[in-house]
């Protein structure tokens, strides 16, 4: 998994799979879901991230037991 925040575009992208994107769907305004040819979720993009996420430049990562 890879998380990227682009200050220039104010977008936060979370990539779950390293696959070619076949289709994108704007689930809600400013929330874009990308899928591969098999319908698997590849990535999630949040537009205007600084207004939607408290601190887009910081990430906390946890693994549940």
List each language-model region with its residue ranges.
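Small, basic N-terminal interaction modules of short regulatory proteins
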Residues: 1-65
């Amino acid at each position: 998994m890879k998380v990227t925040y682009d200050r220039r575009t104010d977008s936060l992208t979370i990539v779950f799979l390293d696959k070619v994107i076949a289709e994108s769907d704007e689930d809600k305004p400013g929330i874009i879901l990308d899928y591969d040819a098999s319908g698997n979720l590849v990535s999630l993009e949040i537009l205007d991230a600084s207004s939607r996420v408290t601190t887009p430049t910081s990430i906390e990562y946890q693994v549940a037991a």
